[in-house]
Amino acid sequence: MKKSIILYSLFFIFFSSNTAAIANEDYVKYVNPLIGTDTSFELSNGNTYPAIARPWGMNFWTPQTGKMGDGWVYTYKANHLVGFKQTHQPSPWINDYAAFSLMPSVGKLSVLENERKLKFSHDNEIVEPHFYSVILDEINTKVEFTVTDRSSFFKFNFPKSENSNIIIDAFFKDSEIKVIPDENKIIGIAKNNSGGVPENFANYFLIEFNRPFKKSGVW
């Protein structure tokens, strides 16, 4: 009887210790959101984009190398970024729904994609399921963002400059932007879609800044 009790006790202790070790394991570190992004229209190697999001989150965020309306939002071989995009895209073939993007700028303001795009290197990029960071060397600016179930937090680390800007691109198809400078807020509606939506389909968003605007405008 004593031997049975001792063996049972040892097994129980071993099992309990092993369970605690598993519970404390950080499985997020094993996830690489870049898997499947080395792809193109001509050759599919996954057709994915690095989705920074909570599980079942309302919105996904992703760095953007493709042009507005291009289903290949982020391709690993690209060396320029045109924005950081809130996306609801299920696949490149279906394209996106109710999307808009943010993009920092320093110096002369250019809002068009081909003019505002900036070089980046994967060596200066951190991509995790819950966090993204990249250094844009051309303007000496670091961009970081993380997400919640329904919102996101961005941090733009600009150099000392009298002309640092954040461009908000609400895409097309009757989308709207309104600047509220007295409250450091911008509100907007993104309606872009690829069909199959109700007549009142829209994504209503609010962006709040921690610093006042020196100037603002829409185009």
Give the residues covered by each predicted segment:
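Positively charged n-region of N-terminal signal peptides that target proteins for export
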Residues: 1-4
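Sec/Tat signal peptide C-region and signal peptidase I cleavage site
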Residues: 18-22
